[in-house]
Amino acid sequence: MLFITSNRHKYEEAAEFLGNYNIDIKWKNMKYEEIQGDTNKEISMDSCRKLMYKIKDDFFIDDTGLYIDDLNGFPGPYASYVNKTLGNKNIIRLASGSRAHFETVISLFYSGKIYQFSGILNGTISDHESGSMNFGYDPIFIPDGYDKSLAELSISEKNRISHRSKALEIMVEFLKKQ
């Protein structure tokens, strides 16, 4: 099965997680145009529909957003763009201590149909960056029940709790029934 993403970190997390279920995925490093939708679900579905005409094999894609309560859900599905333009330091300045959550929506093209699976991770925006696993907002996001950022967790630790692993777990359960 192909995982279509231009983000190596997403692929590494998914490959490690799915490997625990003996599911081998191949990375297709491919950029594709995304709509500027209001939800990760909408963006993921639209992208999957476009890609299913280009790629005939089974594949999945992932769209993830960060929703900060004190900013009325901003940046939401625009998380990647905002991270590139504002960066973590400015998010800290705007939202340190705010409740937030990540949402990942996976769209799976399987046997000619599209299926969607989502996962959420709740937490808080930190007052500083920390950790060496520097991927997106991980250095400033402290998951509920932890006193350290996602960037301070190993991939296997992160995969036990993350929004992406929760969505992947639901996808695995779906695939087991097929």
From Swiss-Prot:
Residues engaged in binding Mg(2+): E34, D63
| Xref: InterPro entries | dITP/XTP_pyrophosphatase, ITPase-like_fam, RdgB/HAM1
Q: Which domain of life is it from?
A: Archaea
Which terms are listed as keywords in the entry? Hydrolase, Magnesium, Metal-binding, Nucleotide metabolism, Nucleotide-binding
> What molecular function terms (GO) are annotated for this protein?
dITP diphosphatase activity; ITP diphosphatase activity; metal ion binding; nucleotide binding; ribonucleoside triphosphate phosphatase activity; XTP diphosphatase activity
Needed cofactors: Mg(2+)
User: What is a single Pfam family found in this protein's UniProt entry?
Assistant: Ham1p_like
Annotated active site residues, numbered on this chain, are D63
Q: What biological-process terms (Gene Ontology) are attached?
A: nucleotide metabolic process; purine nucleoside triphosphate catabolic process
Reactions this protein catalyses: XTP + H2O = XMP + diphosphate + H(+); dITP + H2O = dIMP + diphosphate + H(+); ITP + H2O = IMP + diphosphate + H(+)
Q: Name one GO cellular component term.
A: cytoplasm
Similarity remark: Belongs to the HAM1 NTPase family.
Free-text function comment from the UniProt entry = Pyrophosphatase that catalyzes the hydrolysis of nucleoside triphosphates to their monophosphate derivatives, with a high preference for the non-canonical purine nucleotides XTP (xanthosine triphosphate), dITP (deoxyinosine triphosphate) and ITP. Seems to function as a house-cleaning enzyme that removes non-canonical purine nucleotides from the nucleotide pool, thus preventing their incorporation into DNA/RNA and avoiding chromosomal lesions.
Assembly and partners are described as:
Homodimer.
Identify this protein by name: dITP/XTP pyrophosphatase
Give the organism, scientific name. Picrophilus torridus (strain ATCC 700027 / DSM 9790 / JCM 10055 / NBRC 100828 / KAW 2/3)
